[in-house]
Amino acid sequence: QHSIEWFRKRLGNFTGSQIGLLMKKGRSDYFSDTAKTYIYQVASERDMNPEIINDDVEFEKYLHQVCVNTKAMQWGTDQEENARELYERLTGRHIVETGSCKHPAIEHFASSPDGYYYDEETGEKGCLEIKCPIQSTFMKYKSEIHNNASLLDVKFEYFYQCMAHMMCTGAQWTDFVIYNPFQSNPIHIVRILPDEAVFAEMEKRIRVADDIVKELIEAE
């Protein structure tokens, strides 16, 4: 993840990390103002000059303009591998890293789990979503997040990110993992399960948003 090719593959797609934005309704409109801004962003990506996309130097300039990367975000990214290794030791599961996974049926929808698990004998498939927050946030999540409902309540965008992973990979679960190496018990694992009603609502809103993107591009 986070390589230049990874960013290229995500371009113009509705992605797991942002999909929660589409799930917020406006007071009078189908989409909230935040959702509309995201739709405009996806439309702009899909309508980008291909010469810019395919030129590494120019595309790097573009990424520098659009990507926010705070110290806290970079620290979280740097800690992901440690979180994955500890998860493997605790669960005995072998986790592989994966890139952007496109949904098999919903056009322009993709998600990038922080890890993927597959058991060849049983066919069991699972995903990881790893967050490495500061200590106060770690304690908040550890005390308040225990299942689907509480994740939706505490951090709705992470809930929809976990759902997107399962939709795009066909996984039977996503383990939502929070990690902070400074704590005496540095990892908290919450099993998030698929919800077909949520999947259906997500698909509906993604398809409506995608139609708007196509209209925006064709209107030029």
Model features per residue range: what roles?
Residues 1-78, 86, 144-152:
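Charged, glycine-rich intrinsically disordered N-terminal tails and low-complexity linkers that flank
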Residues 79-80, 157:
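Residue-level preference for nonpolar/small residues embedded in alpha-helices
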Residues 86-218:
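Nucleic-acid nuclease catalytic cores
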